[in-house]
Amino acid sequence: MTKQTLTQLEQHELFLTRHIGPNAEQQQEMLNFIGAESLEDLTAQTVPGKIRLPQDLTIGDSCGEAEGIAYIRNIADKNKVFKSYIGMGYYGVQVPNVILRNVFENPGWYTAYTPYQPEIAQGRLEAILNFQQVSMDLTGLDLASASLLDEATAAAEAMALAKRVSKAKKANIFFVADDVFPQTLDVVKTRAECFGFEVVVGPASEAVNYELFGALFQYTNRIGQITDYTELFATLRDNKVIVTVAADIMSLMLLKSPGAMGADVVFGSAQRFGVPMGYGGPHAAFFVARDEHKRSMPGRIIGVSKDTRGNSALRMAMQTREQHIRREKANSNICTAQILLANMASFYAVFHGPQGLKTIASRINRLADILAAGLTAKGLTLANTTWFDTISVKGADVAAINARAIAAQVNLRIDADGVFGISLDETTIRTDIADLFDVILGAGHGLDVATFDADIVANGSQSIPDALVRQDAVLTHPTFNRYQSETEMMRYIKRLENKDLALNHSMISLGSCTMKLNAAVEMLPVSWPEFANMHPFCPLDQAQGYTQLINELSEFLVKITGYDSVCIQPNSGAQGEYAGLLAIKKYHESRGDAHRNICLIPQSAHGTNPASAQLAGMKVVVTACDKQGNVDLEDLRTKAAELADSLSCIMITYPSTHGVYEESIREVCEIVHQYGGQVYLDGANMNAQVGLTSPGFIGADVSHLNLHKTFAIPHGGGGPGMGPIGVKSHLAPFVAGHTVIKPGRESDHNGAVSAAPYGSASILPISWMYIKLLGTKGVKQSTQTALLNANYIMKKLSAHYPVLFTGRNDRVAHECIIDLRPLKETSGVTEMDIAKRLNDYGFHSPTMSFPVAGTLMIEPTESESKVELDRFIEAMISIRGEITKVEAGEWPVDNNPLHNAPHTLADIMDPEFDSRPYSREVAVFPTAAVKANKFWPTVNRIDDVYGDRNLMCSCVPLSDYE
């Protein structure tokens, strides 16, 4: 008979033991090795006492998986999933089950990281390249990005690009047609204010009346009208205006492309291509421009290059445009955006093929034709004379019609001017049209869908004017024409997955990235229709489940961060930075201090920080760090005093980007506050704070939180992410608002930073589940175990590699930096060589050359077991032994396993391999552990320079994949 109590047998803390990698016995073994008695002892040795929380968090007890699922099921059931015809950029979809199961719900796709190591990311790089091909084909332009966050932020990026490339250098006006989606205008205005641009809104035809650097048009527009802008665009371009277009991706299967009309930039949401609405996200935006603007494009771009064997290979192109290199001079602060969703959209296009997509688009248009025919037959007046999917009606009794609609569980678009609209989508069927007739006309209308259909077949429809009917063939590449069978599609997805290394294969120890477990139980609710199928602009009383979830998650985050309130809207970490800095900016303006525009940033900061500051209209001043990587207090004090009249804020990261808890963090906050500035604490390293300290307790005023790092949302191969901000009470009135949905916050009047009021709301259940399941004890123990794992690796490797920075008692926080520069001096082996060699050992490289060039930053997270840590340590020690052979001259500097890494099957099958000074076994099976779990890179080291000099960002011939 067991002596355990019933409470113990109920295993409420079982999830904690599943989430944390090392078990109790392994933890004690590791603690003994590093010289600590317990996790509490390690914490006391590592974290400065003056910033330790005086008491534990109060976020509730841990709970079991079944209990957590039952609780969130209760929340989900409070959402009312009506049939939504609201449109405005969000539409019902039928996610192909082969994509839902094999991509969206597959850790091989959702747990990978941004493809900085392209040799072990060829699968998703191919899928992203397909996305770029879809974007280019449908828009009729030359060069596409790998995705942006959403349509509205893409519009803001298009405006910024227009200013950068416009030859009308004296112009400062950006024109926005008055029929764009309101959330897009909202985000554009927010961004324009920071840049000092003037935004003029008016009828599209009036754009020619202004001296502009750029203009934005919606195609099709808010009420559904389709307009041929060819002549207008030509006139604008003659006047040196950069023409940007927000386009509907599904409509472009039938409509003349914006590129053919003369647009310079085309963007939009790819949500209609198989991605659920999700109460606003996450969705991928496409962004396409003329080739001449390629150096000014925002975001990632995937390009084709060659590897050392001369084979085609994919990689991220033109990275010198981006924030991690150009910092405040970057085109955008965007890091990666929505790669998982872009991949879903690309697979949707591959699975349906051009004919299938055209059939879907034609069905939507036919149903819209039938709806319009029925309504006009009954005397209703349409507000639009052309359409793809949206019918708008004016002069009707909107209140009565909307009441009938709500009673029938139908949402219509209700405009302020007495117009209502119906946007049809892929999920609409003929019985829905009959139901809409009932809702709009009342019972007894006598209309028959089949009769109208027969008439349209016989006599045609002019909903799309002849001049706007697409004539050119699209998606002609073989990839879009060979996988329409589910068997073939399943195998294609699997072939690509097999080329990529994700967390389902091995640890990804990227410093500052927190690649922890994304537990299956946390992911389950995201696919539920109660979360997936909600329109973000539905009435709030239909979204009571989401409201409860957001409120509870916000309360969790308030307690964890020590702030007073949280804004959920930012849909990436970079957007969170931007939103937090905007709150600071507006706070200063409210006090008559609009001149405060200096942002102090330590030289060790991530490149996103200065890029975000520039985006918020601030001027960056860099402060020095000392030899230990800490903020130089004297330099900070001097610059804060010198800039006191114009000081807006400081952006700092804690623990520092050097992986240590700086002892002087409170003094940093006090100095900045003394001179009238605010403290922005970057939440990138929050995984070393939760339960031990907090930004608010330290003295910061605002932070963004990377829910895709600390709070278990997966990285998706480069997105999605979420970057909500926590603020002290004095900044709460200045966080992002929204023009469409106003839930009653004191900040509702502020502009938006994302298209949807709650950003990528459908992935919030992941973070809610993470916190709910772990509870007070679990989140603290997770942080402590992250410290343990990092210090264990640091001490194990310190006998073989110099450790660059340590804090008190020679401890590191949740990550450590090893210095490879001395080895480069003695052997010629670079950090790149070591990173690629780790691929042969079955590992993704740690972060290279950040925050210090010539280093690797290692962050194991709490989720990795001692077995996996030891396997990684063994690999690093083995690599050090290989470097020793190079140092000793046993292997040439230019012909050794590191220089030639990674090794592929083609290498070891090559008879010429025998001329190398090392064996095939050394190349591909350097340790016994590798033999047991071999990952094969599918290409050799890729030539980045060749790829940028010979830029190609579209699908390569199919033979290159064979």
Swiss-Prot record:
- Record-level GO cellular component terms: cytosol; glycine cleavage complex
Q: Identify the Gene3D superfamilies for this entry.
A: Aspartate Aminotransferase, domain 1, Type I PLP-dependent aspartate aminotransferase-like (Major domain)
Co-factor(s): pyridoxal 5'-phosphate
Which PANTHER family did the record assign?
GLYCINE DEHYDROGENASE (DECARBOXYLATING), GLYCINE DEHYDROGENASE, DECARBOXYLATING
Q: Which InterPro entries match?
A: GcvP, GDC-P_C, GDC-P_N, GDC_P, PyrdxlP-dep_Trfase, PyrdxlP-dep_Trfase_major, PyrdxlP-dep_Trfase_small
| Molecular function via GO | glycine binding; glycine dehydrogenase (decarboxylating) activity; pyridoxal phosphate binding
Pfam families on file: GcvP2_C (PF21478), GDC-P (PF02347)
What do we know about how this protein assembles, alone or with others? The glycine cleavage system is composed of four proteins: P, T, L and H.
Per UniProt, what is the name of the gene that codes for the protein in this document?
A: gcvP
**Its job:** The glycine cleavage system catalyzes the degradation of glycine. The P protein binds the alpha-amino group of glycine through its pyridoxal phosphate cofactor; CO(2) is released and the remaining methylamine moiety is then transferred to the lipoamide cofactor of the H protein.
Catalysed reaction, written as an equation: N(6)-[(R)-lipoyl]-L-lysyl-[glycine-cleavage complex H protein] + glycine + H(+) = N(6)-[(R)-S(8)-aminomethyldihydrolipoyl]-L-lysyl-[glycine-cleavage complex H protein] + CO2
Q: Give the protein family.
A: Belongs to the GcvP family.
**Descriptive protein name:** Glycine dehydrogenase (decarboxylating)
